[in-house]
Swiss-Prot record:
Name listed for the protein in its UniProt record: Leucine-rich repeat LGI family member 4
CC per GO annotation: extracellular space
Compartments, as annotated in UniProt: Secreted
Gene: Lgi4
Listed GO biological process terms: adult locomotory behavior; glial cell development; glial cell proliferation; gliogenesis; myelination; myelination in peripheral nervous system; neuron maturation; regulation of myelination
Stretches forming EAR repeats: 210-252, 256-298, 302-349, 351-394, 396-439, 441-483, 487-532
Keywords: Glycoprotein, Leucine-rich repeat, Repeat, Secreted, Signal
Length: 537
């Protein structure tokens, strides 16, 4: 609203310009008063001595630099309030509290440093609001909360930076029964001069993810797994130098993880949990001394060894995975010995017994269970050839295909996104790879430099599909899958403290908090907390 428009509006509000002489002391200096209307210009401070029947107040070129909370408590009858050509460093929260009858608020052609998100609180009768031409680059989120009676909002003439700070405004506009004038964006350059109300909120990326260090678990570890038992999340670490499988739980009073139980397992490489109702199994795959199955039949008992697993077959285990076949739980143990073979162990009565030997003489380093085309599949990585994909047919695994252009792959992990299945293939030196299943085979999608990598682990944490590429020589890298691009994008480095020879990652959610465990072979296990940051706030 220009100066002429303001003047006409005030004359109309005054009603035929009827002269009125206010009681002595009721019209402050620098002000012109009528019975129901006042215009003040150039006053060094906010006037207070007004008639209790005052309906409209206009403040022009004031010397006030700050509108404080409760600035208008002595003017409860105001229906219209106008500011123009002023300079405010800040408009504080509750600046207009007490103006429950105010219908028109025009704050126009001013220079405003900042506005509190609670500045307009209490204006329950407000119908017309103008913040036009105030040099504002953004508005605080929730500024209009509680203004249910608004019918007209004018935000034009402000140099809005149309980044994440305006996302809340774009999401708010369709939800109100008010006409909103927004004007054009002043920046960033990609959207400069585009009308703000023409922007698509869905194209804004205003969530940030951060993994911050929380805790250290002293001993080194080769693997880490999460599982839920009796409704409580647990973690189990394979600690070969300590000779144990260490089970951790969350201490709600100390707000950190603490040991709950440990299983004696010298030279252990993997501790794989399986929960069947009240019963808990832990498979301890060991390099020497025989792999064992531990069991707890009820929550009030401790885990005890119940079975030595296939002592003639499991010669040098390197990895163990859990999978379900025809409704029964099975373990697959990848064997890295020269004369060994990967073994499938399935439940039969009280224990787990060999069901099938796979991939003899290939020195397998990793096994990954996955589902493709609605059927169980098994992917084996080995030191001697490209990864081989098996599928479950007629009660056994049969070779289906291998992974092209994937030599020297140490480990494989998979994830799903947007209905597609992706592989993360770990190579120690060179390029680790991301591949996508096309219905008949996996095809190369992306390559990421590896510098001493033994693990390339995908993890779904909250809404973030992450993948962590470990490194023995540098900081481990965290990537996030961007669904619109279909690739992994760098997110952050893990550290400090730096991970020393990371070998496995796992995530767990406890009491609404999300944690990432990093098992390290030459250093302590590190625990990080996952945070979601709203950049539009």
């Amino acid at each position: 609203m220009g100066g002429a428009g303001i003047l006409l509006f005030l004359l109309a509000w005054a009603g035929a310009g009827v002269a009125w002489s206010p009681p002595k002391g009721k019209c402050p200096p620098h002000c012109s008063c009528s019975k129901e209307n006042t215009l003040c210009e150039g006053s060094p401070e906010l006037p207070e001595s007004f008639s209790t029947t005052l309906l409209s107040l206009s403040l022009v070129r004031m010397g006030v630099s700050r509108l404080k909370a409760g600035s208008f408590l002595k003017m409860p009858s105001l229906h219209l309030l106008l500011f123009t050509s002023n300079t405010f460093s800040v408009i504080e929260g509750d600046a207009f509290i007490g103006l429950s009858y105010l219908q028109y608020l025009f704050i126009e052609d001013n220079k405003i440093g900042s506005i509190s998100k609670n500045a307009l609180r209490g204006l329950r009768s407000l119908t017309h609001l103008s913040l036009a031409n105030n040099h504002l680059e953004a508005l605080p989120r929730f500024l209009f909360r509680g203004l249910e009676t608004l019918t007209h909002v004018d935000l034009r003439g402000n140099p809005f930076q149309c980044d994440c700070r305006v996302l809340w405004l774009l999401q708010w506009m369709p939800t109100v029964n008010a006409s909103v004038g927004t004007g054009a964006c002043a920046g960033p350059p990609a959207v400069a001069q585009i009308q703000l109300n023409h922007l698509d909120p869905k194209k804004f990326k205003c969530r940030a993810t951060e993994l911050s260090w929380l805790q250290t678990v002293g001993e080194s570890a080769l693997s880490v797994e999460s599982f839920s038992y009796q409704g409580e999340p647990h973690m189990v670490l394979a600690q070969p130098f300590a000779g144990r499988c260490l089970i951790l739980v969350w201490d709600y009073s100390l707000q950190r993880f603490r040991p709950e139980e440990e299983l004696s397992a010298p030279s252990v490489v993997s501790c794989k949990p399986l929960v069947l109702g009240p019963r808990l199994f832990i498979l301890a795959a060991r390099l020497w001394g025989g792999s064992q199955l531990w069991s707890r039949s009820s929550p009030d008992l401790r885990l005890t060894p119940v079975q030595v697993l296939a002592p003639q077959r499991l010669l040098r285990p390197n990895d163990a995975e859990l999978l379900w076949l025809d409704g029964q739980p099975c373990f697959v143990v990848a064997d890295a010995s020269k004369a060994g073979s990967t073994t499938l162990l399935c439940r039969d009565g009280p224990g787990f017994y060999p069901r099938q030997s796979l991939h003899a003489w290939h020195r397998d380093t990793d096994a990954e269970a996955l589902e493709l085309d609605g059927r169980p599949h098994l992917l084996l990585a080995s030191a001697s050839q490209r990864p081989v994909l098996f599928h479950w047919v007629g009660g056994r695994f049969e070779r289906r295909t291998d992974i092209p252009e994937a030599e020297d792959v140490y480990a494989t992990k998979h994830f799903q996104a947007g209905g597609d299945v992706f592989l993360c293939l770990t190579r120690y030196i060179g390029d680790s790879m991301v591949m996508r299943w096309d219905g008949s085979m996996f095809r190369l999608l992306q390559q990421l430099p590896s510098r001493g990598s033994h693990v390339f682990q995908p993890l779904l944490i909250a809404r973030d599909q992450l993948a962590i590429l470990g490194s023995d020589f540098a900081f481990s890298q965290v990537f996030r899958f961007e669904s619109d691009k279909g690739i992994l994008e760098p997110l952050q480095e893990l550290g400090p403290p730096a991970l020393v020879a990371p070998r496995a990652f796992a995530q767990v959610t406890v009491a609404g908090r999300r944690f990432l465990f990093a098992a390290c072979f030459k250093g302590p296990t590190q625990i990080y907390q996952h945070h979601e940051l709203d950049l539009s706030a």
